[in-house]
UniProtKB/Swiss-Prot annotation:
This is Uncharacterized protein TP_0802.
Amino acid sequence: MQHAPTQSQDTPCTRQGCSPFIYARRAGTPLRAARTAKTMQPRETSSCKRKTQYNLGSVTSGAHTITPAHAKLPLAQRYCKFTRVTREQHYPENNWENGLICRTPADTL
């Protein structure tokens, strides 16, 4: 199980330091995220304080990790996207405070 770095280990957000994360936040506008098919990389907030790791083994956000059933799926069969829902609304095992959701395409039907 992997854990994201704590706030004390965070570094100032720079374009080089936050690579390969993509930023969509502008002044006064909400963060909009669209998943990219090539990289399958979830977008991150502009503050760079909560890194989201995406690999074949697990998706971590803070101290929460996806379920083992989702972790065993191939990379092409699952995707991540950001929403505004909270962790308690639905899919409690796959939602976190920052809104990252990882689930299989069958769950979207």
